[in-house]
């Protein structure tokens, strides 16, 4: 019986302390009405200010060497880009000087290939 009385006393003390520490009424000092949903937002959606800056930049640089028309293109190259010896880049009749001086269409740019040296004969 003594154990039952002790258990009842402990339960009563725990119940009283739990009730005393509970929040009775609106929390955080509220007025006691309203749902409380969104009350923490204040006037956040009233006056506002925003700023946005964006900058974008790009660039490129290149350097290349090569042949386009004959042995070069532009001032300072032999024959000023017309090739050696003055062949056009597109062929007849669209070459620099027309037929028969223009290279045929589809032929490689630049000077013609030099003929092969004759074979040496064996003489003893």
Swiss-Prot record:
A Pfam family cross-referenced in the UniProt record is SGP
* InterPro entries assigned to the protein according to its UniProt record, in alphabetical order: SGP
The entry's keywords: Signal
The signal sequence is 1-22
Q: What does this protein do?
A: Structural protein of the sulfur globules, which are intracellular globules that serve for sulfur storage in purple sulfur bacteria.
- Subunit record text: The protein envelope of the sulfur globules is composed of the three different proteins CV1, CV2 and CV3.
The UniProt entry's sequence similarity note says: To C.vinosum CV1 and T.roseopersicina TR0.
Q: What is this protein called?
A: Sulfur globule protein CV2
Which source organism does the UniProt entry give?
Allochromatium vinosum (strain ATCC 17899 / DSM 180 / NBRC 103801 / NCIMB 10441 / D)
């Amino acid at each position: 019986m003594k154990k039952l009385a002790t258990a009842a006393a402990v339960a009563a003390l725990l119940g009283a302390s739990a009730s005393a520490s509970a929040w009775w009424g609106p929390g955080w000092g509220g007025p006691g009405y309203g749902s409380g949903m969104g009350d923490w937002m204040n006037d956040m959606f009233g006056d506002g200010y925003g700023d946005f800056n964006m900058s974008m930049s790009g660039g490129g640089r290149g350097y290349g060497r090569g042949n386009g028309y004959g042995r070069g293109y532009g001032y300072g190259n032999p024959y000023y880009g017309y090739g050696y010896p003055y062949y056009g880049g597109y062929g007849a009749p669209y070459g620099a000087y027309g037929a028969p001086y223009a290279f045929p269409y589809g032929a490689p740019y630049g000077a013609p290939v030099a003929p092969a040296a004759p074979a040496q004969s064996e003489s003893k």
